[in-house]
Amino acid sequence: MNKMLYIKTYGCQMNVYDSNRMVDLLETQGYNIVANMADASVIILNTCHIREKASEKMYSELGRIKKLQQSRLKAGKSKAKIIVAGCVGQAEGEEIFIREPAVNIIVGPQSYYNLPTMLEKLDSGTENHLIDLDFVEAAKFNKLPEVLKSPTVSGLVSVQEGCDKFCTFCVVPYTRGAEFSRPLEQVYREVLNIAQQGAKEVVLVGQNVSAYHGKDENGKECSLADLIKYVAKIDKIKRIRYITSHPNDMTDQLLSLHATEEKLMPFLHLPVQSGSNKILKLMNRRHTRERYLEIIQQLRELRPDIVISSDIIVGFPGEDDEDFEATLSLAKEAKFGQCYSFKYSQRPGTPAAVKQQISEEVKQHRLSILQAQLMLQQLECNQKLIGKVVPVLFDRDGKYDGQIIGKTPYMQSVCIMNEKDNNLYGKIVNVKILSASASSLFGEVCPNS
Protein backbone atom coordinates (compact mmCIF):
# COMPACT_ATOMS: atom_id res chain seq x y z
CA MET A 1 0.00 0.00 0.00
CA ASN A 2 1.26 3.48 -0.93
CA LYS A 3 1.75 5.33 2.37
CA MET A 4 2.68 8.91 1.56
CA LEU A 5 2.08 11.69 4.10
CA TYR A 6 1.72 15.42 3.51
CA ILE A 7 1.25 17.78 6.45
CA LYS A 8 0.55 21.50 6.46
CA THR A 9 0.96 23.46 9.68
CA TYR A 10 -0.78 26.66 10.70
CA GLY A 11 -0.11 28.86 13.71
CA CYS A 12 2.23 28.68 16.66
CA GLN A 13 5.42 26.79 17.43
CA MET A 14 3.41 24.34 19.51
CA ASN A 15 1.64 23.32 16.31
CA VAL A 16 5.01 22.96 14.58
CA TYR A 17 6.07 20.64 17.40
CA ASP A 18 2.83 18.64 17.14
CA SER A 19 3.27 18.30 13.38
CA ASN A 20 6.80 16.98 13.86
CA ARG A 21 5.48 14.43 16.35
CA MET A 22 2.69 13.35 13.98
CA VAL A 23 5.37 12.67 11.40
CA ASP A 24 7.38 10.67 13.96
CA LEU A 25 4.26 8.72 14.88
CA LEU A 26 3.18 7.88 11.34
CA GLU A 27 6.70 7.06 10.16
CA THR A 28 6.59 4.17 12.65
CA GLN A 29 3.54 2.97 10.67
CA GLY A 30 5.44 2.98 7.38
CA TYR A 31 4.46 6.42 6.09
CA ASN A 32 6.93 8.55 4.13
CA ILE A 33 6.73 12.34 4.22
CA VAL A 34 6.30 14.05 0.83
CA ALA A 35 6.72 17.70 -0.10
CA ASN A 36 3.97 17.73 -2.74
CA MET A 37 0.37 17.36 -1.60
CA ALA A 38 -0.55 15.74 -4.92
CA ASP A 39 1.70 12.77 -4.08
CA ALA A 40 0.12 12.09 -0.68
CA SER A 41 -2.23 9.30 0.31
CA VAL A 42 -2.84 11.05 3.65
CA ILE A 43 -3.14 14.83 4.01
CA ILE A 44 -3.05 16.45 7.46
CA LEU A 45 -3.96 20.07 8.10
CA ASN A 46 -2.71 20.95 11.59
CA THR A 47 -4.81 23.99 12.36
CA CYS A 48 -4.81 27.16 14.44
CA HIS A 49 -7.86 28.84 15.97
CA ILE A 50 -6.32 31.99 17.45
CA ARG A 51 -7.71 34.30 14.77
CA GLU A 52 -10.67 34.03 12.44
CA LYS A 53 -8.49 34.20 9.33
CA ALA A 54 -6.52 31.18 10.52
CA SER A 55 -9.57 28.90 10.50
CA GLU A 56 -10.84 30.32 7.21
CA LYS A 57 -7.46 29.53 5.65
CA MET A 58 -8.08 25.91 6.56
CA TYR A 59 -11.44 25.84 4.80
CA SER A 60 -9.90 27.50 1.74
CA GLU A 61 -7.22 24.81 1.72
CA LEU A 62 -9.88 22.10 1.99
CA GLY A 63 -11.51 23.55 -1.12
CA ARG A 64 -8.23 23.22 -3.00
CA ILE A 65 -7.80 19.66 -1.75
CA LYS A 66 -11.25 18.74 -3.11
CA LYS A 67 -10.16 19.86 -6.57
CA LEU A 68 -6.98 17.84 -6.15
CA GLN A 69 -9.08 14.79 -5.24
CA GLN A 70 -11.04 15.14 -8.47
CA SER A 71 -7.79 15.23 -10.44
CA ARG A 72 -6.60 12.09 -8.66
CA LEU A 73 -9.79 10.24 -9.58
CA LYS A 74 -9.47 11.28 -13.23
CA ALA A 75 -5.91 9.94 -13.20
CA GLY A 76 -7.13 6.60 -11.88
CA LYS A 77 -5.80 7.15 -8.37
CA SER A 78 -7.72 6.75 -5.12
CA LYS A 79 -8.66 9.75 -3.02
CA ALA A 80 -6.29 10.85 -0.29
CA LYS A 81 -7.49 10.61 3.30
CA ILE A 82 -8.01 14.08 4.78
CA ILE A 83 -7.29 14.80 8.44
CA VAL A 84 -8.04 18.03 10.30
CA ALA A 85 -5.88 18.20 13.42
CA GLY A 86 -5.21 20.92 15.96
CA CYS A 87 -7.23 23.68 17.52
CA VAL A 88 -9.85 24.24 14.80
CA GLY A 89 -10.65 20.56 15.00
CA GLN A 90 -10.95 20.80 18.78
CA ALA A 91 -13.11 23.92 18.68
CA GLU A 92 -15.45 23.09 15.80
CA GLY A 93 -15.59 19.31 16.03
CA GLU A 94 -18.28 17.63 13.93
CA GLU A 95 -19.29 20.98 12.41
CA ILE A 96 -16.29 20.46 10.14
CA PHE A 97 -17.85 17.27 8.74
CA ILE A 98 -21.07 19.20 8.08
CA ARG A 99 -19.29 22.08 6.37
CA GLU A 100 -16.80 19.86 4.53
CA PRO A 101 -17.84 16.17 4.27
CA ALA A 102 -14.63 15.34 2.38
CA VAL A 103 -12.77 15.40 5.71
CA ASN A 104 -12.27 11.86 7.06
CA ILE A 105 -10.70 12.37 10.49
CA ILE A 106 -10.80 15.13 13.10
CA VAL A 107 -8.37 15.02 16.03
CA GLY A 108 -7.60 17.56 18.73
CA PRO A 109 -4.13 18.60 19.89
CA GLN A 110 -4.26 16.14 22.79
CA SER A 111 -5.53 13.09 20.89
CA TYR A 112 -3.52 12.78 17.67
CA TYR A 113 -1.58 9.86 19.13
CA ASN A 114 -4.63 7.78 18.09
CA LEU A 115 -4.10 8.50 14.38
CA PRO A 116 -2.65 5.05 13.51
CA THR A 117 -5.73 3.29 14.93
CA MET A 118 -8.08 5.74 13.21
CA LEU A 119 -6.34 5.30 9.85
CA GLU A 120 -6.60 1.52 10.20
CA LYS A 121 -10.36 1.86 10.67
CA LEU A 122 -10.59 3.95 7.50
CA ASP A 123 -8.53 1.39 5.60
CA SER A 124 -10.87 -1.39 6.74
CA GLY A 125 -13.77 0.41 5.08
CA THR A 126 -15.97 0.23 8.17
CA GLU A 127 -15.78 3.97 8.86
CA ASN A 128 -15.57 7.10 6.72
CA HIS A 129 -15.75 9.82 9.39
CA LEU A 130 -13.88 9.53 12.69
CA ILE A 131 -13.40 12.07 15.48
CA ASP A 132 -11.37 12.09 18.71
CA LEU A 133 -11.29 15.25 20.81
CA ASP A 134 -10.50 13.72 24.20
CA PHE A 135 -8.52 15.71 26.76
CA VAL A 136 -6.55 13.00 28.56
CA GLU A 137 -3.79 14.59 30.60
CA ALA A 138 -0.33 13.25 29.72
CA ALA A 139 -1.71 10.52 27.43
CA LYS A 140 -0.22 12.10 24.33
CA PHE A 141 3.33 12.18 25.63
CA ASN A 142 3.10 8.73 27.17
CA LYS A 143 1.94 7.14 23.91
CA LEU A 144 3.99 8.97 21.29
CA PRO A 145 7.29 7.42 20.16
CA GLU A 146 10.02 8.84 22.38
CA VAL A 147 12.86 8.90 19.87
CA LEU A 148 12.46 11.69 17.34
CA LYS A 149 13.29 10.82 13.74
CA SER A 150 13.70 14.34 12.38
CA PRO A 151 17.18 15.67 13.11
CA THR A 152 17.22 19.45 13.18
CA VAL A 153 19.71 22.13 14.10
CA SER A 154 17.16 23.85 16.32
CA GLY A 155 14.64 21.54 17.94
CA LEU A 156 11.28 22.33 19.50
CA VAL A 157 10.33 20.41 22.63
CA SER A 158 6.92 20.84 24.24
CA VAL A 159 7.28 21.04 28.03
CA GLN A 160 3.92 22.54 29.01
CA GLU A 161 0.49 22.69 27.40
CA GLY A 162 -2.76 24.49 28.08
CA CYS A 163 -3.44 27.69 29.98
CA ASP A 164 -5.35 28.66 33.13
CA LYS A 165 -5.23 32.43 32.61
CA PHE A 166 -8.46 32.78 30.57
CA CYS A 167 -7.63 36.06 28.82
CA THR A 168 -10.95 37.28 27.45
CA PHE A 169 -9.73 37.28 23.82
CA CYS A 170 -8.15 33.82 23.81
CA VAL A 171 -9.40 30.35 22.87
CA VAL A 172 -6.39 28.41 24.19
CA PRO A 173 -7.99 27.28 27.49
CA TYR A 174 -10.89 25.89 25.46
CA THR A 175 -8.85 24.20 22.72
CA ARG A 176 -5.73 23.12 24.63
CA GLY A 177 -7.23 22.65 28.09
CA ALA A 178 -5.87 23.31 31.56
CA GLU A 179 -2.17 23.77 32.24
CA PHE A 180 -0.23 20.54 32.24
CA SER A 181 3.54 20.12 32.61
CA ARG A 182 5.57 17.15 31.46
CA PRO A 183 7.83 15.36 33.98
CA LEU A 184 11.36 16.72 34.19
CA GLU A 185 13.07 13.49 33.12
CA GLN A 186 10.72 12.98 30.16
CA VAL A 187 11.64 16.42 28.81
CA TYR A 188 15.33 15.79 29.45
CA ARG A 189 15.26 12.52 27.50
CA GLU A 190 13.58 14.18 24.53
CA VAL A 191 16.13 17.01 24.48
CA LEU A 192 18.92 14.46 24.74
CA ASN A 193 17.44 12.57 21.78
CA ILE A 194 17.42 15.59 19.50
CA ALA A 195 20.90 16.60 20.66
CA GLN A 196 22.22 13.17 19.72
CA GLN A 197 20.71 13.67 16.26
CA GLY A 198 22.48 16.97 15.68
CA ALA A 199 20.45 19.69 17.39
CA LYS A 200 22.60 22.51 18.78
CA GLU A 201 19.67 24.55 20.05
CA VAL A 202 16.51 23.61 21.92
CA VAL A 203 13.40 25.76 22.20
CA LEU A 204 11.25 24.80 25.18
CA VAL A 205 7.68 25.56 24.15
CA GLY A 206 4.34 25.86 25.89
CA GLN A 207 1.20 27.96 25.77
CA ASN A 208 2.39 29.41 29.08
CA VAL A 209 5.85 27.93 29.37
CA SER A 210 6.88 30.10 32.33
CA ALA A 211 4.18 28.32 34.37
CA TYR A 212 6.03 25.00 33.96
CA HIS A 213 5.74 22.90 37.13
CA GLY A 214 6.72 19.38 36.11
CA LYS A 215 7.88 16.87 38.71
CA ASP A 216 11.23 15.14 39.01
CA GLU A 217 11.70 11.43 39.66
CA ASN A 218 11.20 11.97 43.40
CA GLY A 219 7.89 13.76 42.89
CA LYS A 220 9.31 17.20 43.65
CA GLU A 221 7.76 20.03 41.64
CA CYS A 222 10.28 21.87 39.46
CA SER A 223 10.14 25.33 37.91
CA LEU A 224 11.06 26.37 34.38
CA ALA A 225 14.34 27.69 35.76
CA ASP A 226 15.05 24.25 37.26
CA LEU A 227 14.26 22.63 33.91
CA ILE A 228 16.53 25.00 31.98
CA LYS A 229 19.43 24.35 34.35
CA TYR A 230 18.91 20.60 33.99
CA VAL A 231 18.72 20.67 30.20
CA ALA A 232 21.83 22.89 30.10
CA LYS A 233 23.83 19.91 31.39
CA ILE A 234 23.54 18.28 27.95
CA ASP A 235 26.91 19.09 26.36
CA LYS A 236 25.73 19.01 22.75
CA ILE A 237 23.04 21.63 23.42
CA LYS A 238 24.70 25.02 23.01
CA ARG A 239 21.66 27.30 23.00
CA ILE A 240 18.42 27.28 25.00
CA ARG A 241 15.32 29.39 24.42
CA TYR A 242 11.77 29.27 25.78
CA ILE A 243 8.45 30.50 24.44
CA THR A 244 5.72 31.71 25.21
CA SER A 245 5.65 33.31 28.65
CA HIS A 246 3.13 35.23 30.74
CA PRO A 247 4.33 38.22 32.80
CA ASN A 248 2.66 36.86 35.95
CA ASP A 249 4.85 33.75 35.89
CA MET A 250 8.18 35.50 35.39
CA THR A 251 9.70 34.67 38.78
CA ASP A 252 12.87 36.20 40.21
CA GLN A 253 14.50 32.77 39.85
CA LEU A 254 13.71 32.68 36.13
CA LEU A 255 14.72 36.29 35.55
CA SER A 256 18.03 35.79 37.37
CA LEU A 257 18.83 32.79 35.19
CA HIS A 258 19.22 35.15 32.22
CA ALA A 259 22.32 36.53 33.98
CA THR A 260 23.84 33.25 35.13
CA GLU A 261 23.12 30.54 32.54
CA GLU A 262 25.36 31.09 29.52
CA LYS A 263 23.39 28.68 27.32
CA LEU A 264 20.17 30.67 27.85
CA MET A 265 20.02 33.08 24.93
CA PRO A 266 19.67 36.85 25.50
CA PHE A 267 16.21 36.95 23.95
CA LEU A 268 12.76 36.79 25.49
CA HIS A 269 9.33 36.76 23.89
CA LEU A 270 7.00 38.22 26.52
CA PRO A 271 3.53 39.19 25.24
CA VAL A 272 2.04 42.36 26.70
CA GLN A 273 -1.04 42.69 24.39
CA SER A 274 -1.78 46.32 25.39
CA GLY A 275 -0.12 49.28 27.06
CA SER A 276 -3.33 50.49 28.68
CA ASN A 277 -4.21 49.36 32.20
CA LYS A 278 -7.88 49.72 31.35
CA ILE A 279 -7.59 47.36 28.39
CA LEU A 280 -5.32 44.96 30.26
CA LYS A 281 -8.04 44.65 32.89
CA LEU A 282 -10.72 44.08 30.25
CA MET A 283 -8.46 41.42 28.73
CA ASN A 284 -8.10 39.75 32.15
CA ARG A 285 -4.34 39.84 31.73
CA ARG A 286 -3.79 40.03 35.52
CA HIS A 287 -0.83 42.39 35.24
CA THR A 288 -0.43 46.13 34.80
CA ARG A 289 1.58 48.24 32.41
CA GLU A 290 3.85 49.19 35.30
CA ARG A 291 4.53 45.58 36.29
CA TYR A 292 5.37 44.64 32.72
CA LEU A 293 7.88 47.48 32.38
CA GLU A 294 9.33 46.57 35.77
CA ILE A 295 10.05 43.04 34.49
CA ILE A 296 11.72 44.46 31.38
CA GLN A 297 13.86 46.81 33.47
CA GLN A 298 14.87 43.96 35.77
CA LEU A 299 15.86 41.81 32.79
CA ARG A 300 17.99 44.58 31.29
CA GLU A 301 19.75 45.15 34.60
CA LEU A 302 20.53 41.43 34.74
CA ARG A 303 21.38 41.04 31.04
CA PRO A 304 21.96 44.46 29.41
CA ASP A 305 22.13 43.10 25.84
CA ILE A 306 18.85 41.16 25.99
CA VAL A 307 16.36 41.69 23.14
CA ILE A 308 12.69 41.73 24.09
CA SER A 309 9.96 40.55 21.73
CA SER A 310 6.23 40.84 22.33
CA ASP A 311 2.67 40.47 21.03
CA ILE A 312 0.23 43.37 20.79
CA ILE A 313 -3.47 43.42 19.93
CA VAL A 314 -5.05 46.64 18.66
CA GLY A 315 -8.76 47.35 18.44
CA PHE A 316 -9.79 45.32 21.46
CA PRO A 317 -13.40 46.17 22.47
CA GLY A 318 -13.35 49.34 24.56
CA GLU A 319 -9.99 50.61 23.28
CA ASP A 320 -10.12 54.37 22.66
CA ASP A 321 -7.47 56.71 21.27
CA GLU A 322 -5.94 57.25 24.71
CA ASP A 323 -5.60 53.50 25.24
CA PHE A 324 -3.96 53.12 21.86
CA GLU A 325 -1.51 55.93 22.61
CA ALA A 326 -0.63 54.11 25.84
CA THR A 327 0.22 51.03 23.76
CA LEU A 328 2.42 53.05 21.43
CA SER A 329 4.27 54.59 24.36
CA LEU A 330 4.78 51.24 26.07
CA ALA A 331 6.22 49.70 22.89
CA LYS A 332 8.67 52.58 22.71
CA GLU A 333 9.54 52.50 26.41
CA ALA A 334 10.04 48.72 26.38
CA LYS A 335 12.27 49.11 23.30
CA PHE A 336 10.92 46.01 21.61
CA GLY A 337 13.47 44.65 19.16
CA GLN A 338 10.79 42.42 17.64
CA CYS A 339 7.03 42.44 18.00
CA TYR A 340 4.04 40.68 16.47
CA SER A 341 1.01 42.93 16.16
CA PHE A 342 -2.55 42.04 15.21
CA LYS A 343 -6.03 43.43 14.90
CA TYR A 344 -8.39 42.02 17.50
CA SER A 345 -10.26 39.03 16.09
CA GLN A 346 -13.53 37.82 17.63
CA ARG A 347 -13.32 34.20 18.71
CA PRO A 348 -16.63 32.43 19.41
CA GLY A 349 -17.09 31.44 23.03
CA THR A 350 -14.68 34.00 24.46
CA PRO A 351 -16.00 36.84 26.69
CA ALA A 352 -14.63 39.62 24.47
CA ALA A 353 -16.53 38.33 21.44
CA VAL A 354 -19.88 39.55 22.79
CA LYS A 355 -18.75 43.09 23.61
CA GLN A 356 -19.34 46.12 21.39
CA GLN A 357 -16.75 45.90 18.63
CA ILE A 358 -14.49 48.55 17.15
CA SER A 359 -14.83 49.17 13.43
CA GLU A 360 -12.48 47.41 11.04
CA GLU A 361 -11.39 50.78 9.65
CA VAL A 362 -10.25 52.03 13.07
CA LYS A 363 -8.48 48.75 13.84
CA GLN A 364 -6.60 48.83 10.54
CA HIS A 365 -5.60 52.48 11.03
CA ARG A 366 -4.21 51.78 14.50
CA LEU A 367 -2.40 48.66 13.33
CA SER A 368 -0.71 50.58 10.51
CA ILE A 369 0.53 53.26 12.93
CA LEU A 370 1.80 50.68 15.41
CA GLN A 371 3.53 48.55 12.79
CA ALA A 372 5.30 51.57 11.33
CA GLN A 373 6.69 52.39 14.77
CA LEU A 374 7.66 48.78 15.46
CA MET A 375 9.41 48.51 12.09
CA LEU A 376 11.60 51.49 12.99
CA GLN A 377 12.36 50.01 16.40
CA GLN A 378 13.32 46.69 14.84
CA LEU A 379 15.57 48.42 12.31
CA GLU A 380 17.30 50.36 15.09
CA CYS A 381 17.81 47.15 17.05
CA ASN A 382 19.36 45.42 14.05
CA GLN A 383 21.55 48.37 13.08
CA LYS A 384 23.23 48.27 16.50
CA LEU A 385 25.04 45.12 15.38
CA ILE A 386 26.57 46.62 12.22
CA GLY A 387 30.35 46.30 12.45
CA LYS A 388 30.16 43.81 15.30
CA VAL A 389 31.09 40.13 15.33
CA VAL A 390 28.37 37.79 16.58
CA PRO A 391 28.08 33.98 16.83
CA VAL A 392 25.54 32.69 14.32
CA LEU A 393 23.91 29.25 14.23
CA PHE A 394 23.23 28.40 10.58
CA ASP A 395 20.01 26.43 10.21
CA ARG A 396 18.49 26.91 6.75
CA ASP A 397 19.09 27.80 3.12
CA GLY A 398 18.28 31.25 1.82
CA LYS A 399 16.08 32.01 -1.16
CA TYR A 400 19.06 32.78 -3.40
CA ASP A 401 21.48 30.20 -4.76
CA GLY A 402 24.44 29.85 -2.42
CA GLN A 403 22.80 31.82 0.39
CA ILE A 404 22.53 30.38 3.90
CA ILE A 405 20.70 31.84 6.89
CA GLY A 406 21.33 31.56 10.60
CA LYS A 407 20.30 33.11 13.89
CA THR A 408 22.14 35.39 16.28
CA PRO A 409 21.73 34.82 20.02
CA TYR A 410 19.18 37.66 19.79
CA MET A 411 16.98 35.74 17.33
CA GLN A 412 17.83 37.91 14.31
CA SER A 413 18.18 36.26 10.92
CA VAL A 414 21.64 36.60 9.36
CA CYS A 415 22.17 36.04 5.64
CA ILE A 416 25.54 35.25 4.08
CA MET A 417 26.74 33.79 0.80
CA ASN A 418 28.01 30.30 1.62
CA GLU A 419 31.08 29.09 -0.23
CA LYS A 420 30.46 25.67 -1.75
CA ASP A 421 33.40 24.12 0.08
CA ASN A 422 32.40 25.64 3.41
CA ASN A 423 29.51 23.65 4.86
CA LEU A 424 28.11 25.92 7.55
CA TYR A 425 24.79 24.19 8.16
CA GLY A 426 24.48 23.20 11.81
CA LYS A 427 27.56 25.14 12.86
CA ILE A 428 27.96 28.14 15.15
CA VAL A 429 30.48 30.52 13.59
CA ASN A 430 31.48 34.13 14.09
CA VAL A 431 30.05 36.52 11.54
CA LYS A 432 30.85 40.18 11.04
CA ILE A 433 27.65 42.13 10.41
CA LEU A 434 28.01 44.44 7.41
CA SER A 435 24.48 45.80 6.96
CA ALA A 436 20.96 45.48 8.29
CA SER A 437 17.33 45.82 7.32
CA ALA A 438 14.33 45.70 9.64
CA SER A 439 13.95 41.97 9.05
CA SER A 440 17.49 40.66 8.48
CA LEU A 441 21.20 41.14 9.01
CA PHE A 442 23.83 40.62 6.32
CA GLY A 443 27.42 39.67 6.95
CA GLU A 444 30.48 37.60 6.22
CA VAL A 445 32.15 34.75 8.08
CA CYS A 446 35.20 35.85 10.03
CA PRO A 447 38.48 34.21 8.95
CA ASN A 448 39.47 31.18 11.03
CA SER A 449 36.01 31.12 12.60
Curated annotation (Swiss-Prot):
[4Fe-4S] cluster 2 binds at residues 163, 167, 170. GO terms for cellular component: cytosol. It is an enzyme of class 2 (transferase). GO terms for molecular function: 4 iron, 4 sulfur cluster binding; metal ion binding; N6-isopentenyladenosine methylthiotransferase activity. Its cofactor is [4Fe-4S] cluster. It is found in: Cytoplasm. Monomer. Belongs to the methylthiotransferase family. MiaB subfamily. This is tRNA-2-methylthio-N(6)-dimethylallyladenosine synthase. The gene is miaB.
